[in-house]
Swiss-Prot record:
Binds 1 [2Fe-2S] cluster per subunit. This cluster acts as a Lewis acid cofactor. Its EC number is 4.2.1.9. Its cofactor is [2Fe-2S] cluster; Mg(2+). It holds the Pfam family ILV_EDD_C. NCBIfam families: ilvD, PRK00911.1. This is Dihydroxy-acid dehydratase. The modification N6-carboxylysine is found at residue 126. It comes from Pyrobaculum islandicum (strain DSM 4184 / JCM 9189 / GEO3). PROSITE patterns: ILVD_EDD_1, ILVD_EDD_2. It comes from the Archaea. Functions in the biosynthesis of branched-chain amino acids. Catalyzes the dehydration of (2R,3R)-2,3-dihydroxy-3-methylpentanoate (2,3-dihydroxy-3-methylvalerate) into 2-oxo-3-methylpentanoate (2-oxo-3-methylvalerate) and of (2R)-2,3-dihydroxy-3-methylbutanoate (2,3-dihydroxyisovalerate) into 2-oxo-3-methylbutanoate (2-oxoisovalerate), the penultimate precursor to L-isoleucine and L-valine, respectively.
Length: 562
């Protein structure tokens, strides 16, 4: 029997802790239970949306695995903000904020109660990095487990994901489909609980949890409705006590090499640009120096090998059918693109796990490609720099057919203004839509622009218009879109100085973004610029705006920034 009681004796052993034991006896603890490791089961659970609807049930299966391995599991919740439901509303300001809040709530709960080890179950976009940040912050034995993707919907022979609902709004506004057709997409696109079905932010972070070594190999792809999801829950409960017995903690796993492997995997799958922010934040919590320069260098050597939405036509359940994330990782490993000595929570290096893993005997069906003959010859994401983004920006080139664009700026001080312009037909081919004051401090919360980007694509302007913002993009975004512009407008970044009619050049091949005005004119505008007053004087959003760092630092909340 495993007996790894790292911290709990200080809470529950001895005469002086008699009252503490009394509390737990009230929920069924026995004398024997107090001799076992106390293992937290963190469930990011909520009925406010489908993504985390089932995680409480999965937590009970995790407890079974913990019990089998000789521990006692205790379930604790954390908050969930459903990104999709909040898209284009004031609620989206709470999305990125929730990532750091989740990490904070886990720290508070588990440090306050003397937990020896824990398993974190995530679902919707920010629950996953929030849990992983807490894993390395607490540095207790821990395993991450994904709640799983929703099943794709079907309209005849057409496979649907939630991406279709956002884009068909644009099609409807452009007069391309009827209201009845839009309603049909609404009804069919999201048929089960689980997360958004394409390689959007949730599924991106799930795959990266395997690449980082924080989750069991193969655990990312089974749908939320699959019986294998419950089996992985039990296995994760057993695995965390094995990790404790071996002395493996997240900071031994999340090294530079692990972040490197995650970055390679992100670029090879054309995953969500949000993952750049989240990997920077996880690296920060782990004390690992990893910057946009590292991402830039890696991105120039890794092609896209996965045809997953929005870069391709397939959903996460299609990837699961051919072996899931391990099939991607093994291709990258065999091509020499991964650092195989990175340790995992399973107690072995990722290289050893991948050597042993064998893919199922099913064809890849155009879902995956080889590194030698990739789906796209370039990376899924490019880091951009230039006089419009001195500290960097990101462009999801894997989901765009054009890598270069030049046009005249149409400037909007917020997403709502921009969406009204798209809906009114004011955006024309050749425009560069600039949405500013939507950064970490300015919004605050760096909201996603999916409502606008999807409306642009749905209107048939996806390759005829570019969008530049100091905000973020949903993982479902496609087209010529540049986000995370740093410094943001609210702190006086050059994006605050752009005027209607200015020409902007975007080059996804070389990684440059240029505001084509003389430097003297830029300086003249800078002298005339005044910072806007804070949007909030109290409450959570005001606290966040005061603490949050810029996008190139992962938008972490920190005093001081290490």
């Amino acid at each position: 029997m495993v007996k790894v009681r790292i911290r709990s004796p200080a809470w529950y052993d001895g005469v002086d802790n008699t009252p503490h034991r009394s509390y737990l006896r009230a929920i069924g603890f026995t004398d024997e239970d107090f001799t076992k490791p106390l293992v937290g089961v963190l469930a990011a659970w909520s009925e406010l949306g489908p993504c985390n609807y089932h995680t409480l049930e999965l937590a009970k299966y995790v407890k079974e695995g913990i019990k089998e391995a000789g521990g006692v599991g205790l379930i604790a919740p954390t908050i969930v903000v459903n990104d999709g439901i909040n898209m284009g509303t004031p609620g989206m300001r709470y999305s990125l904020i929730s990532r750091d809040l989740i990490a904070d709530t886990i720290e508070a709960q588990f440090n306050a109660h003397g937990i020896d080890a824990w398993v974190g179950i995530g679902g919707c976009d920010k629950t996953q990095p929030g849990i992983m940040m807490a894993m390395v912050r607490l540095d207790l034995p821990a395993v991450y487990m994904y709640g799983g993707t929703a099943e794709a919907g079907w309209l005849g022979e057409r496979e649907l994901t939630i991406e279709d609902t956002f884009e068909t709004v644009g099609s409807y506004l452009a007069g391309k489909i009827t209201l009845e057709e839009l309603k049909r997409i609404e009804e069919l696109s999201f048929p089960t609980y689980g997360t958004c079905q394409g390689l959007f932010t949730a599924n991106t972070m799930a795959i990266l949890s395997e690449a980082l070594g924080l989750a069991l190999l193969g655990s990312a792809s089974p749908p939320a409705t699959s019986a294998r999801r419950k089996a992985y829950a039990v296995a994760s409960g057993r695995a965390v006590l094995k990790a404790a017995e071996l002395g493996i903690t997240p900071r031994k796993v999340v090294t530079y090499d692990a972040i490197y492997n995650a970055a390679v995997t992100l670029f090879a799958t054309a995953g969500s640009t949000n993952a750049i922010l989240h990997l920077l934040a996880i690296a920060y919590e782990a004390g690992v120096k990893f910057t946009l320069d590292d991402f830039d260098e890696i991105s120039r050597r890794v092609p896209v090998i996965a045809a997953l939405r929005p870069a391709g036509p397939y959903a996460m359940q299609d990837l699961d059918r051919i072996g899931g994330a391990p099939r991607i990782l093994k291709k990258l490993y065999k091509a020499g693109l991964l650092r195989p000595e990175a340790l995992t929570v399973e107690g072995e290096t990722i290289g050893k796990l991948l050597e042993r893993w064998q893919p199922p005997s099913v064809p890849e069906d155009g879902i995956l490609y080889s590194v030698e003959k990739p789906y796209k010859p370039y990376s899924g994401i490019r880091i951009l720099r230039g006089n419009l983004a001195p500290d960097g920006a990101v462009m999801k080139i894997g989901a765009a057919d054009k890598l270069k664009f030049e046009g005249k700026a149409k400037v909007y001080n917020g997403e709502a203004e921009a969406f009204k312009a798209v809906a009114a037909g004011e955006i024309k081919p050749g425009d560069v839509v600039v949405i500013r004051y939507e950064g970490p401090k300015g919004a605050p919360g760096m909201p996603e622009m999916l409502k606008v980007t999807a409306a642009i694509v749905g209107a048939g302007l996806g390759e005829a218009v570019a969008l530049v913002t100091d905000g973020r993009f949903s993982g479902a975004t496609r087209g010529i879109m540049v986000g995370h512009v740093a410094p943001e407008a609210a702190v006086g970044g050059p994006i605050a100085l752009v005027e209607n009619g200015d020409r902007i050049a975007i080059d996804g091949e070389t990684g440059r973004i240029t505001l084509q005005i003389p430097q003297e004119e830029l300086e003249r505008r800078r002298k005339n610029w005044t910072p806007p007053p804070p949007k909030y004087s109290g409450g959570l959003l005001a606290k966040y705006a005061a603490l949050v760092q810029q996008a190139d630092k992962g938008a972490v909340t920190a005093i001081p920034l290490r």
